[in-house]
Amino acid sequence: NSSRFSDFGVEVVAEMNKVGIMVDISHVSDNAFYQVMDITKVPVIASHSSARHFTPGFERNMDDAMIARLAENGGIIMINYGSAFVTEEANQYNTKRSDAWEKFLSPEDGAPIDMYNPELRNDRDAFNKQYAELNPYPFATLEQTLDHFDHVVKLTGSVDFVGIGSDYDGVGNTLPIGLKDVSSYPNLINGLMQRGYSNDDIKKILGENLLRVWGEIENGAE
């Protein structure tokens, strides 16, 4: 999408800065991201996005240039654990399943159909279940998830711009092996330790980076 923010859109971002509301750029287009970065006077967050380096073309993740710009802004990218955010294989699985669902629904006359019609939800759930039985889901691993943290740190040269954005409540049964729920956080911490992160680094990743951004946003409010 190459459109520009309306005057009202620019005003909204500026007003969020003014009153101390975080601007979250997960779920926006690349174009919208750069417009936000040109407007905001305080750091922003990507609350549940990962590194597009590992999932080329997947716009819910951030590419290297975006991550670098986010770091310049002082913001943070909070890594999403959903397997489709972590590996290309899982991401392509979703695309192939959607294509199969569309083909399954397509009427013989070729008329357009709304694949996401709420009335078809039960049918879609049943289709997805059968599809998974025939095509087992390629769950990501803890190690592959940790690669995203490493990538951000190496790209920005600092541990200050990455955090945890699990999306435990949003990605359903697609979570990585070893990171299925919050009880798995010791696995994440141990994995970071095994990769050479210090206790102070890990504290930043687990929450201090977000609190730092939060503080800067509050301090920037009028």
Regions found by a protein language model. Name each.
Residues K180-E222:
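Mid-to-C-terminal alpha-helical segments outside catalytic/metal-binding sites
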Residues N1-D24, V28-I45, E59-G75, Q144-D160:
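Histidine/acidic residue-rich metal-binding segments in metalloenzymes
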Residues D64-A126:
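Aromatic-lined glycan-binding groove of carbohydrate-active enzymes
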Residues V23-I25, H48, I77, D167, ...:
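Conserved, mostly hydrophobic/aromatic
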Residues I79-A84, T156-L179:
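Short acidic/histidine-rich active-site segments
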Residues D123-H151, N199-W214:
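C-terminal helical cap
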Residues V28-Y34, A51-F54, A84-T87, G170-G172:
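Active-site environment of divalent metal-dependent phosphoester hydrolases
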Residues N1-R4, M22, R52-G57, A132-A140:
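The substrate-binding groove and active-site-proximal loops of carbohydrate-active enzymes
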